[in-house]
């Protein structure tokens, strides 16, 4: 609660994450990221490092195999497509001794598997939403999306 009370409307989520880690005495953090957000993960890691934290990061495609081997559905059938591996991401960060882990854009479901496998607390820095520029709250902020989703209430803007 100190993170919220001391920094309300003053810090971004990224800054609050560092503040929280330092308040908890954390020295080593992990970042589990989606390959599609590798640049964003890089900038998050750089900020953490600039703030004195040791950072380990693991891409979602670590130790992956082609989806054909497991007869998994593909986004583009007929093309090679590596599967994601959120449990191995968590295991590698566990082995690396991270004290707090952060998610940068893992898919729905993959984020849950990662969180279940992590031995330390997990928070999200970026939540993936391919339609809304990684801003899932846009679906409830936007009148268009509220109407499309059937949640636009009479008299609301």
Question: Which residues are covered by each model-predicted region?
Answer:
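Short Gly/Thr/Asp-enriched flexible loops that form oxyanion-binding sites at enzyme active sites
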Residues: 40-47, 111-120
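Short, acidic/small-residue loops that bind anionic groups at enzyme active sites
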Residues: 54-61, 117-135
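C-terminal functional extensions of proteins
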Residues: 123-157
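A short, acidic, amphipathic alpha-helical segment used as a generic capping/interface helix at domain edges
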Residues: 83-98, 106-109
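Long, charge-dense
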Residues: 44-91
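Short, surface-exposed connector motifs at secondary-structure boundaries
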Residues: 23-30, 92-99
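Electropositive, gly/pro-rich neighborhoods at or near active sites that engage anionic ligands
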Residues: 1-28, 35-39
